[in-house]
UniProtKB/Swiss-Prot annotation:
Protein name per the record: Alpha-ketoglutarate-dependent dioxygenase btcD
Signal peptide residues on this chain, from the entry's feature table: none
Regions that span the bilayer: none
Keywords in alphabetical order: Dioxygenase, Iron, Metal-binding, Oxidoreductase
Annotated disulfide bonds: none
Chain positions covered by the region annotation Disordered: 207-230
Gene of this entry: btcD
One GO location term (cellular component): cytoplasm
Amino acid sequence: MALIKEPLKPTGALDEFRSFDVTPIIGTEFPDASLKAWLEDPKADDLLRELAITVSRRGVVFFRRQDGLTEEMQKAIVQKLGVLSGKPATSSLHRHAHQPDPNADPEILWINSEENKKLLAGTPFDPALPARQSCRGLWHNDISYEPNPSDYALLRITQPPALVVADLPAIDTLWASGYEVFDRISRPIQKFLETLTATFGELRERDGSDPKFQVPRGSPANVGTNLRPTHPVIRTNPVTGWKSVYAVGLHVQTINGLASDESDGLKKWFTKLIVENHDLQVRFRWNNANDVAIWDNRCTYHTATYDHEGYGIREGYRACGVGEKPYLDPNSTGRREAR
């Protein structure tokens, strides 16, 4: 039967560029390609449309040493990825209402390890906790607390910590495949989960008088401080037509219609499927200044590694696109079934 949206098919437009799959399930790297060159190429739309398809199929795509890539170029790439793959005409780039630097471009989130400590202070994930024994709760997808959350995101790390400069591994980022989490679940439970929705939200209450919340944050649907939308537990990615488990991570408040113990049990089980199946994860080491990752928030989750205390600041810039309102297409399939 026909899908709500016809999936996009790869065209081979990127075949001339050297690439490799980092793992069989998730992650592809283009070790020599230049995003700046692709953006400025006369065939830019063909290249970036194919990149969008690749990111949506592989979850996350990596690029090395993207020197010369500016924040404006990051924004242009992320917006084009969404537009060329069919996102709503009313969706643009997310405006981060709690940007650490009030004078910064609201469509670029400044990522800074020292500022991140402040955001996590007083939460169960505070890096300063003397006996912090688990980081499993930090897995998340970006801005799922918005009514229309993210499609694609692009992170460029401009300043790796001194550990990396000294050629020692530190503060890698991990991604996990929501497609594969769905495919690891037995069919009867899949069908049950497809009947459920979840309430999402932020960790902190917001000041309703803050004017930054009174303008659209990348979509007319994303206005105001009531950041508690309802999304399906199982979501269809319109670019691929594949199902993934969406209700995972720190922004998920509750699975609707269930007793609290049942909801908490499902949330913990979803996270367990990630952390106990490392073959559905990919780990990326930020080797150089201006290394880049682009991922699809509809079908992946990610988390940083907090192992660089005392070795300097980690800094970067993220552009985050806004896509469609999440939905489950009853005629869509899991990735394995589609293949």
